Amino acid sequence: MNKNSEINLKEHKIFFVGGKVQKVKDNNILKGKMYVESFIPAKSNNKNIILIHGGGQSGSGFITTADGRRGWLHDFLSHGYSVYVVDQPGRARSGYSSTLYGEYMDRETNIEDAERRFTAMAKKGNWPQAKLHNQWPGSGLRGDKIFEEYMASQVNTMSDRVYIEEMSKLALSELIDLVGETVVLGHSQGGPFCWLAADVRPDKVKACVAVEPNGPPFFNVSYGGIKHSHLNKQTFKKNDFDKKWYQTSLEPDRPNGITYSPLTYDPPLKDDEKLIPKIDENKTPENLVQCFLQKEPARKLVNLSKVKILILTAEASYHSPYDHGTSNFLKQAGVKHDFIR
């Protein structure tokens, strides 16, 4: 798309989906609503796509970039897609209340974390692929105008990952019922929302595009002895299967493998039953994490297997060492998909 090409809209509007009424101090308050901004092009291909941002982000990241260029929204509009950009419940324009949603994580305003993981990986990244990074405009360091604009766009994320997935699943179900058949694109912390949406609406979600989805399965990893600020509550210890440049958490963070909240498995999990993780015995190269799968016999993700899926990972990203784990988890669970790294 030409960066200056004109895009005409048939309709542009804002609305909210999801939410439940909760009584707080004798007041009835709507909790878990999701902000949606819709863009309907004048020249439509009669296809829809829902864009779900990641942690520390809002839907604005799909509209424009930190250096002022057009975001992915405009690319999809130029190809005729009707685009629905959301702010996750409890985030940005969906509204936040500590009474309703609890504590925030502190990572979104952590400058060192942002430089290392997002903007200056070649200089500060502590995983093997970081040296390949060359795409960020400007220096990627504090004091740089584009970096400061990026940091100003960051918004806090609530700590309760299970609850945010449950609220988002409810809101996305309502949105999908409203717009009909759709593609769902989720980024990073919003990546697993693709799995949740496909699980609850497998006949309406035509495809999932998971851009560096939250992972790896079950256990988190810490690079170079430095924990990402959102992992501060977890304990890490060197395992026999860890490479010298990372450590794996002692306890699982995602009890459902690729999500915090439940998915539909066959055979189904009982109320008091959990997936059992087991290290993948297929050895990975030195620059890749040794990830976990289900203990065999593996349960199948019967609803996700009905949906076209693409996992997309950038070569220098901190996801690059471990997103194969998500791909292998889906494969073991009977889900055909494409994985590009």
Which residues fall in each region the model found?
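Short, surface-exposed "cap/lid" segments of acyl-processing enzymes
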Residues: 43-45, 49-85, 91-132
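Catalytic histidine neighborhood in serine/cysteine hydrolases
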Residues: 331-341
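Gly/Ala-rich beta-loop-alpha elbow adjacent to hydrolase catalytic centers
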Residues: 185-194
